[in-house]
C-alpha cells in the first residue's frame, strides 16, 4: 500500500468538513476549493494532517487567488498537526491547499465547489483520492475545537 498521510480540511465558517484530501498513494495531500459568494465574508480554515510517519512531513501551502497565505501551526504532536488560517474574501475565489505544487501532483488533487449563496457544496473532481464532504462538522471532529464567538478555537494546548 505504501505511505499515506490523512488530510482533513474544515471550512468552519460554512460548517463543512472536507475529509481525506490526500492522494491514494504517496505522501502528497491537498485540494482546490472554489468558493462562490455575493458579498464580503470571512472564512476560517482548520487543516488537520495525520501523517503516517513524523520524521519529515512536507509543508502545506495555501494560496487564495494565487496569493500566498500563511498557515498558523496551532498544534503538533507525534500523530497530528493542526493548522489554521482566516481569510476575507470579497468575490468568487479559488483556494489551493497543496503539499506539492508540481503539476504531476496538482492534477491528481480533488476540486471542491462551495456556493455560499445557495448553501451548496459538492466534489467537482475526486482526483486520485477518496475525498468526501460532511456537513455539519461532526462532533468527533469538533472535539479539537471549542466554539467561541462563532468560531472554533484550538483547545489542544489547555
Curated annotation (Swiss-Prot):
Superkingdom, taxonomy of origin: Viruses
Function of the protein: Plays a role for multiplication of the virus in different cell types.
Keywords tagged on the record: Early protein
GO biological process, alphabetically ordered: viral process
Any single Pfam family the record assigns to this protein: Pox_C7_F8A
Protein name, per record: Probable host range protein 2-1
Organism: Myxoma virus (strain Lausanne) (MYXV)
Keyword Nucleotide-binding on entry: no
Protein family: Belongs to the poxviridae C7 protein family.
Keyword Cell inner membrane: no
Record-linked InterPro entries: Poxvirus_C7/F8A
